[in-house]
Swiss-Prot record:
Zn(2+) binds at residues 17, 19, 37, 40. GO terms for cellular component: ribonucleoprotein complex; ribosome. Gene3D superfamilies: Ribosomal protein L31. Keywords: Metal-binding, Ribonucleoprotein, Ribosomal protein, RNA-binding, rRNA-binding, Zinc. HAMAP family: Ribosomal_bL31_1 (MF_00501). Binds 1 zinc ion per subunit. It comes from Caldanaerobacter subterraneus subsp. tengcongensis (strain DSM 15242 / JCM 11007 / NBRC 100824 / MB4) (Thermoanaerobacter tengcongensis). GO terms for molecular function: metal ion binding; rRNA binding; structural constituent of ribosome. The gene is rpmE. Disulfide bonds: none annotated. This is Large ribosomal subunit protein bL31. Binds the 23S rRNA.
């Protein structure tokens, strides 16, 4: 590695989430702020929301006069 061209690497960088969770990781920034983390993300918490796309399908069928089989 060439000296003087690489950013400083911090082994104790703090990641702060909007939910209040903090953890330590390695990064070129000393502090990182995120909006969502593994403690509050729906995939990890098991509280997934199901997106209702049924209305769009029904509108498509109605537009093209298709019947459900």
């Amino acid at each position: 590695m060439k000296p003087g061209i690489h950013p400083t690497y911090y082994h104790d960088a703090v990641v702060k989430c909007a939910c209040g969770n903090t953890f330590i990781t390695g990064s070129t920034k000393k502090e990182i702020r995120v909006e969502i983390c593994s403690k509050c993300h729906p995939f990890f918490t098991g509280q997934q929301k199901i997106v209702d796309t049924g209305g769009r399908v029904e509108r498509f069928r109605k537009r093209f006069n298709l019947e459900e089989k």
